[in-house]
Every structure is written in structure tokens, then in C-alpha cells.
Amino acid sequence: DMVPLTGLNRALVAQGLKVMRRRANAGLAALADVAGLDATPDSGHLGFLLGPRVNAGGRVGQSATGSDLLASDDPVQAAALARRLDDWNRERQTLEAATVEDALALVEREVAAHGGHAACLFIARAGWHAGVIGLVASRLVERYARPAVVIALDDSGQGKGSARSIAGVDIGAAIIAARQKGLLLNGGGHPMAAGLTVAADKLEALRDFLAERIARVVTDRDLTPELTLDGALRVPAADRALWQSLSGLGPFGIGNGTPRFAVLRARFVTAEPVGRDGAHIRAILSDETGRGRLKAIAFRAGGQPLGQAMLAAARDGLGVALAGTLRADDWQGREGVQLIVEDVMTGAPQTAAS
């Protein structure tokens, strides 16, 4: 899900999705069932529902299970393997949540030590599971808008690391340069993601090398999150017909992003925390006159500035503009659409020009 969906890769994914829709592969059909996927599969489902379950076996040392599932032509065997992967995925989610919490505490100390200006986040700790550190690095990039390197140290004195980056910072090249300088036992990657193996006694040198290299190329603007908008609309216009028109531009992913809209002159009809520990914020929107209804959700926004702003605007009845992408909402056979919220603005001009 970090490889650009352009050229041949885009063609392969598009064709693969067509094949998946036939449900002829017993393993994929079973996986879709345990994941609760009752909609037409798209690239988002690959990255967020099916892919994590296929990978879950590898994250707990049972990597063959995913390939066994995909190779199976026995529906009964496939269902059993899919349930096993689903269970491991739940374990992975619990493990990831605990590691993210631990990592955030370390990062807060690092950010404070550098006055909030560290160009690259770099954290290492013994006891972390190497199978989830890439996911943790992605969460850190998402929250802090800067490259992140997360390393799990084992008892032998080696560390397995994953790095994730932002646009404009080639983290793969940085990791390869560190390897060539003798700071890594192994390592490589591409502009947005990389992996590495490092001896514990090289951690400080690696941290300094990456910090210096990335600081040379990154600017304050690079570290300021920006959202590129593809259009502006009002709540009544965000409907299934629009989503169907946009879906013809897919499959979406790196290099071919899902169209992002500003939803202008909107109000919250409802907004509430949902999920484990209120991790997400779910809402219903109307336009400023009360016309239309649009379901919306902000993932992992609970307790974060985005979620707090949404709840405050709903409580105070404020007009808002939101930035996000549209996704099909087929819950219980309903052919609707919902907004995946990425940002919210209150008390500002709400015109297409602004």
C-alpha cells in the first residue's frame, strides 16, 4: 500500500479487483467474509481490511498461513484459515495499540528535547514486537508530519527497524546511504518506506546521521501538514451518484490519490466518539440551512485536535468546512456515501475561492 498505483502496478491492481469481485478464489472470499466486507472490493479494502489480515500471520511468526489461504481451493479449509488470520489480526491490533502508546511517550520526550523541531523522529526500545513497528512508524508520521524510524531491539543486541516518510524526503535513499557508511547491518527501501537491521552500539551514530541528512533537505513547510483539495461542494451534492462517477478514476492509492473535497457551509447534526476508547469520531452533517444528510467519520481522531474540534463545533452549533474523501456506505444494504474527515475549520470564509 506504499507503492505508487501508476503504470503496470495500477493495471495489475485494477485487473486483480475485477477478479476478486467474482469471489472465485476460496481464500479471498473467506477473508472478505471474516472482515465483514459486503461491498464491492476496492483498493481501500485491500489496504485496510484484507491486507492486514493476510499479513497478520507474519507479524506473529506464522507467515505461511496467508499464502496457504490464498492457495486454498477448499472453502472449509479457507474459512478456518481466514478465522485464524482474523484472530491474529485482533492480537496485532492490541499489540500495535500498546506499542503506539509506548512510542508516543518516547516521541513526546524527543520532541520536547528538540523544541518540537526534530526533522526526523527516531526511537528504539527493547521488548517491542518487530512485526508492528512499521505500523507504529506510520502512526507517528500521521500524527507528527515528519519522517519516523522505529526500532525493536532483541536480546542479541540487534535492532529491526522500519522507517516511513513524507513527500519530499526519500527515506529509502537515506537508509541505503547509512548502510553504505557502515552504520547498518542491512537496509533498503523506497522514497516513502524502508527497513533496516542495526547493531545496538550503532544507534546513536545512526540517529545523528539520519537527523543531519534529513535536516539538510527538509524545510519547515515540509513539516507543516497540507491537504490538496480537488474540488468544493455542499452536503446535498455529496451523494452516491457523485461517488460512482469518481470511482471510475480508481483504483486509488499512492500516486493516484482519492479525490479530496472541501465540504462547505456545513453543520453537525450529531457527533460522537465511537470505537475502542472513543478512538474515532462519527458524525452526521447537513448544510447550514438543514438540507441534506451526510454521514462522516474521522478515524483515530479521538482525543486529538481534529476530534476535539468536531465535538466542540457540534456542541456549539458552529458552521464548519471539512476536508475529506468520499467512500461508499453499503451498511445493511444501504447504497449511500460517507465522508472520511481529514480536517475541519470553523469561523472562516466558506467559498470555493477561499
Q: Over which residues does each language-model region extend?
A:
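Short beta-strand segments
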Residues: 51-53, 123-124, 151-152
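A structural signal for small-residue-enriched, beta-sheet-centric alpha/beta enzyme cores
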Residues: 4-5
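Flexible, glycine/threonine-enriched loop-and-boundary segments that flank and lead into catalytic domains
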Residues: 109-138
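Acidic, two-metal ion nucleic-acid-processing modules in DNA metabolism proteins
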Residues: 9-52, 56-106, 138, 142, ...
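Short glycine-cluster motifs
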Residues: 149-165
